[in-house]
Amino acid sequence: MMRRNWRCLLATAAGVLMIACPLAVRAGPPFLTDDPEPVDFGHYETYVFTQWDNSPGNGSTVTGPAVEFNSGFLPNLQLHLVTPFENTTIPGMPNAFGFSDTEVGVKYRFVTESATRPQIGIFPMAELATGDSARNLGNGQTWYRLPLWIQKSFDNGKWTVDTGGGAALNHAPGQRDYGFGGLLVQRSLGAGLTLGSEIFTQGATAVGSTPTTFYNVGGYINPSDQFSILFSVGHSIAGQSHAIGYVGLYYTYPRPAKQ
């Protein structure tokens, strides 16, 4: 559901840039924290986006053009695919541009929301090693993320709170398994505008790196019930310095049913 279901912010970083502790967790566009709400059964959504992560002294990654596709394959079950191009800039190394790692996943909501309980779901993902890690365009090995997400709406849906987290399993050379989690609060302001802010933290992603915590703000504009413009900017507030951002276009089809 587009109102709260935002996918995929951070690209899969690679090589030296990963060792420099990149943002390794993707989340609901344009935020890092995800939600448990799948695409409606028989519906589809597509994102075309770019995103960036700049770490002074360590380099930068710009993802784009990238495409995300989500399908409501069954009631309460969504299939997920991201195919990104990526540009990496690392001090002392040649710039690289090309196809990076492919993300696939399945979102399953096993508790639906009611007046007294939140909705809860899992969203396991695999980052397939389709990029050229020798050029810093991929991890070099397939790795996995295993999160659980919780969401509750308030005041007739004007306020929405998402929280949750999980574990990333990455056994590529120089990489580490780590935990991650976040808290996101969003407010619908009417006239097709929603804004939100979040705190997101993750453990050390690579040998020699440190845990990092981010503060991120953003939102989306809905010119119609099928099309949206997404945006966010953020910065680390603990750990290694990172400046991040996301801009994307979203389209859902067929037209959502009227509430």
Where do the PLM segments sit?
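Bacterial N-terminal signal peptides that target proteins for export
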Residues: 2-13
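Bacterial N-terminal signal peptides
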Residues: 11-22
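Transmembrane beta-barrel domains of Gram-negative outer membranes and organellar outer membranes
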Residues: 25-259
